[in-house]
Amino acid sequence: MNPVRTLSATKAAFFSAYPRPINAVYRRVVEELLVELHLTTVNSTFVYDPFFALGLVTLYDGLMEAYHPPEQREAIFNALCKALHLKPEVLRKNARDLLELMGSGDPRQRLDLLCLKPEAEDVGGLKAILERMTQPPYAYSRVLAVGLYTAYEVVAKSLYEEPEERTRRFLENVVSKLPFSTERVRKDLELYRSSLDRMKQARAVVEEMVKAARRQQERRQSAASLPETSLGDPSKPGS
């Protein structure tokens, strides 16, 4: 039996895979996500599925959307996955495939599938995955909740205009069929949205600081490029 890896080992693996410094605004985000994912994946009842993959990709991409330099976003994601013994390319492919499945065909049929209605048409083996979730023990996580809601929203957007109604119907019709607390799912979705809002505010502050620094640098460069004014030699006539 393999020993459960420790949080310190997971952190060490991450920083070994990505030794570069992470921008201060995002370092806490990455570390908190790493801890959350570690605790989820070492749970003995954790099951990897496309909904978890979609949740992880959605969470990460949403929180790290404005990270600079942009080319480092994927490098950090890859290091995060590898530290958790997950394959980043598989995660992204599973997430894309799930979004494509939910976006194809009749929206109401896809919605019926998520609601586990007996007459719902199965696509991509999703019915078996969802039915597996109904059989406890099944590790619940915020990442899984975000994945389920993201898949649901693909079809629900065309049926229900208001976000509040979409969330309410998701809790009533999808989560209620699963052995998860609807209240906990609701709070986790609220936490996710508030985290996105905080990151947007933080980005706005950082962007303003960058603009201010750039303006100050431009003023200095302009001042340095001005020709020196000669006042002449006061000891000479006409000076």
Curated annotation (Swiss-Prot):
InterPro entries: Thf1
Biased composition (Basic and acidic residues): 211-221
Coiled coil: 183-221
One annotated GO biological process: photosystem II assembly
The entry's keywords: Coiled coil
NCBIfam families tied to this protein: PS_II_psb29
HAMAP family assigned: Thf1
PANTHER family: PROTEIN THYLAKOID FORMATION 1, CHLOROPLASTIC
Its job: May be involved in photosynthetic membrane biogenesis.
Protein name as annotated: Protein Thf1
Source species of the chain: Synechococcus sp. (strain JA-2-3B'a(2-13)) (Cyanobacteria bacterium Yellowstone B-Prime)
Gene designation per UniProt: thf1
